Amino acid sequence: VMTMSYVDEVLAELIEKNPAEPEFHQAAKEVLESLRPVVEQNEEKFRKDALLERLVNPERQIKFRVPWVDDKGQVQVNTGYRVQFNSAIGPYKGGLRFHPSVNLGIIKFLGFEQIFKNSLTGLPIGGGKGGSDFDPKGKSDREVMAFCQSFMTELCKYIGADTDVPAGDIGVGGREIGYMFGQYKRIRNLYEGVLTGKGLTYGGSLARTEATGYGLLYYTQEMLKCNGHDLAGKTVVVSGAGNVAIYATQKAQQLGAKVVTVSDSTGWIYDPEGIDVELLKEVKEVKRARLTEYAAARKSAEYHEGRGVWSVKCDVALPCATQNELHLDDAKALVANGVIAVAEGANMPTTLEATEYLQENGVLFAPGKASNAGGVATSALEMSQNSERLSWTFDEVDAKLQGIMVNIFHACDDASKKYGFEKNYVVGANIAGFEKVAEAMTAQGIV
């Protein structure tokens, strides 16, 4: 009788035990598939220690009700979640997402991915994620505060600077972090770095806003350099017009490249003179307007409705908008136009088919869990500053970020070579992230 491989066994059991959680199934499958070469070399030991079963089962899952009173005096009830997935290499770390789509499966998918991303940073942080199905859109400041205070009143029992340090994610920005920090401090009577993404007046870090976009470019620059290319003088296409896209564009231009596009949910800009970052920030961060305003204010810019940035000829493509935004057709257009590298700024922006097509055609492809890890890396640097009760200058944080991103690239590169998948940075990232966690778990026994 053909026995199933250990990876297949674990996946089959995971799907059976966690029904109706497709996002979690997809994430576990993607990671475990790429870990096959490592698992095969250690199959007997891993199986005996149930290492993969322990890896895919969170250490702790917390689900709670969140009652709060709206502006009309009506009591509303939401559901809160915190999945503490793995603490082998440090306290749990991962964002809080407030969005109507949030359910346990989505939080598990994000928490599982976070284990490997956090491991790759080289910093001592474990994996976790949390959130609620609360929708901050259309709510008043008072309602958001009431919700955040109720949410933290329960969550505060499970977190702490040396236990679990949440951060922001979709629907959770500086305002929400502030309200939650205030409530934690009031209930626990502790002023500690229990959350990251804090304001600069109460323990936040300089360069955190820029971190994901800047980090993406430091990673891309190193990937190009190690493959005989130079970022300077290259034409770059960026999608998105949010935090990641803006600071990726700024850093690309500082490093001598020319960024010719940005996009938002309604359309995109082609600017052959190069995107004017200050104008883009004015339109998006100050006015919170559409890109039509950018085009109206700049002669060299053309505005196009709908999607289409990937049709523009470029050397480097940086998807920085949202998940599954770069499809197979887009990948074909990029390859036909001679693209050298694609690096993910958003989480999972490239579909599986598009990723495979790019890799088959010799394009250097950087997976988000490596190339956009600058955000969580800088969160860990914020934790360091809180522990030391001091704050570093912008340049100090930026220099540390650059070093971390270069190290992440080499960790992915080395792991891809070690297992015979040279230049496959997707496999490299998963293996490099896994090896550290697996070694730490093994050293700490069956816990």
Pin down the residues of each PLM region.
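Rossmann-like adenosine-cofactor binding region
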Residues: 267-365, 370
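Adenosine-phosphate binding glycine-rich loop
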Residues: 3-27, 223-224, 335-447
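Glycine/serine-rich phosphate-binding loop and adjoining beta1-alpha1 elements at the start
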Residues: 99, 118-232
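Structured beta-strand/loop patches that form or line metal/cofactor-binding pockets in enzymes
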Residues: 45-74
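Glycine-rich phosphate/diphosphate-binding loop of Rossmann-like nucleotide-binding domains
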Residues: 196-199, 204-313
